[in-house]
Amino acid sequence: MSTAVITTPGLIQFLNTMRNHMKLCGYSSGTVKAYLGQVQSFISFNRPTNLRNITGQAIQSYLNQLVDSGLSRSTIDQATKAMEILYYELFGKQLNLSGFKRPRKKRPAPIVLTSNEVCQIACHAKTSRNRLMIELAYSAGLRVSELVEVKVGHLDLDRLMLHVPGFDKNKRTTFFSKHLKESLIKQAGAKNTSQYLFPSERGGTLTTRAVAKFFKKALIASGLKKLATPHSLRQSFVNLMLNQDVDPVALQNTLDLRALNSLPSPNSKKAA
């Protein structure tokens, strides 16, 4: 490793050029700042006498050093992207990192709510529609994206079942609590089968952001200290089923879980 480094004026000029090119490519000012910071950290580590002396091997060694130092996956991803931009800026071609192994992403511990806690949150929802959405998401183990897409025709009220549309193997049928039947009948009202069960004010699809917003308000009003999100309802339903000794494979198929290891551990009570 060389003890001499490129001159400051030369480095500043290069970083300014790189900054301008990233802005032209549509990167936000925050992203540009972060990537330039990663480039400067690499140069301080590598100390090249000339930027064009930088090699793909040197970059890979630097990234491996970052991995070994225990940095998070997101930081490694940011550094990798910055190095790819740096290399392309210098040589006009893609950086080959085929031998570089990034650390695995750490899955956050699922936030599990008890049935009483779900009820507590639902009871503090501002409207009966919002309350029913919280209850149905929990009772049927729905993703938020699935919840907002439910149409009246997806309900089988006699059999207490809900058809969840999807592509090919992602199509499935789940179930819901009999205690929701009357509320669902009322919510469906005079809507035809092709209409959304929980439409927006304009009659279209309610956004997942809107669900997150009213869920957060209900959570705060409930007084619970868990950092739950709408997705916690699905995770909590899975935990409830496992505690009732439901076959994990059957549960995986019913809820379209990507892998059995995505299930929270039975009796999990962790809060973030």
Could you say what each language-model-derived stretch is?
Residues M1-A272:
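Conserved catalytic core of the tyrosine transesterase superfamily
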